Amino acid sequence: GKTGLIRHCFQFPEIKQDYYTFFIDIYDSRSLRDLVFALSKEILEVLKPIGKKALHGFWECVKSLQASISFDVNGMPSLNLGLGDIQAPATTLDEIFRYLEQADKPCLIAIDEFQQITGYAEKNVEATLRTYVQHCNNARFIFAGSQRHVMGNMFLTPSRPFYQSVSMMHLESIPLEEYMRFACMHFKRAGKEMEESAVTTVYQQFEGVTWYIQKVLNTLYNMTPE
């Protein structure tokens, strides 16, 4: 689905080489604090393998989290970030965007289930994020969501902060013919057989929803002997 598509694009060599890519899913988030924690954790996890220089740049910007990030005598980072470390979400959010603006490479940030921010306890979260996004020239954002009507209201209603601030893309279901070709090809490569009618049944049963179709086809693949 949309998550797999975004992650797939992030793996393109020209993207991996020239950008920092961050992906967070905020479906379970209930507050700005949850969002800030998810974003902070993702940035740390992405930067750590890159090296101490990249991580140190984030560390210098995010003063409110410095107690959770330490460096040993060899300069290797140690991360111990928990939700409880986000004591002042608004402050940490400001610091994160300061980092994104100053990062040594452009940043791509994907936020999945973005519609969740409409239910946060804090007021004006949409307006706050819109302001930061608007003024962050070193980053581009992908806002994905599964509740199409909520996402539509956020970006198409004139009174909402994100009105006309993005290019909208609706992802339709992958055509049945593509699933047939894809599934039968992989079964055949493994010396297995898959009837096209079975693919049709799975597709119709789950109304073209990618996650369910792939899950069932994968199960059938593992159950089918060569």
Model-derived features: positions:
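Short, conserved phosphate/pyrophosphate- and ester-handling motifs at nucleotide-, phospho-/glycolipid
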Residues: 2-3, 209
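P-loop NTPase nucleotide-binding core
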Residues: 3-108
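Short glycine-/polar-rich loops that comprise or flank the Walker A/P-loop
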Residues: 17-21, 137-139, 164-167
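An amphipathic alpha-helix signature
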Residues: 33-40, 176-184
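Conserved Walker B catalytic segment
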Residues: 79-147, 156
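Short regulatory helix/loop adjacent to the ATP-binding pocket of P-loop NTPases
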Residues: 148-166
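Conserved AAA+ ATPase "SRH/arginine-finger" region at the nucleotide-binding site
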Residues: 167-178
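Amphipathic alpha-helical "lid/sensor" segments that cap RecA-like P-loop NTPase cores
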Residues: 184-226
